[in-house]
């Protein structure tokens, strides 16, 4: 398990090592020149105006609320073939629920206070591809039950926001106003000190029964 977690950390380091900081060239190229676009005084309302204005320009070549770049490079040429392709898709049954439990187990052992973010799916994309809203919400409830029943109660759940204007950048990733909502939800968690949590793990979440369970989560035995 420790080896697994070490691997996760290495992957995380690799992922974030190129992010812009004041000590590398990316700061000047990717951050400094954009600072002039920000309001002089911090304001979510003003930031939302800026985000919305930018999003309108960058999503103006399609009806899905998806960035022009993503649409042009990933969807445009095959869009017709993708219509209805997710009508039989479901995330309710998956071995990844067991994988999640492995991560929770390590967090509990280290008494790490964490916040989980549940992103939405682009509602227009969901409708176009036929992805079941009911099954999607069922998967979200299953995830939430696995977390909350074991004491992982810090959850930023945006699963119902996939239809909000300019909330998404593509099919499944949050965009302009989505990141503002993310900041509002996560900022209190990272800025306020909290006591180390106490978790109550249930090893039944490691079982194949749970991975394949389709019923009401709190009725799982």
Predicted features, each with a name:
Residues 90, 94, 130, 173:
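Charge-dense, low-complexity intrinsically disordered segments
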Residues 132-135, 139-221:
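C-terminal regions of proteins
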Residues 10, 94, 122, 163-167:
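Alpha-helix initiation/capping motif
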Residues 101-115, 143-154:
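A structural motif corresponding to the C-terminal end of an alpha-helix
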Residues 82-86, 123-126, 155:
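A generic short-segment signal for beta-strand/edge and adjacent turn/coil regions
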Residues 1-108, 203-221:
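Secreted/periplasmic serine-hydrolase-like ester/acetyl group-modifying domain
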Residues 69-77, 112-121, 158:
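A glycine-rich, aromatic-flanked flexible loop/lid motif
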Residues 106-131:
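Active-site segments of SGNH/GDSL-like serine hydrolases
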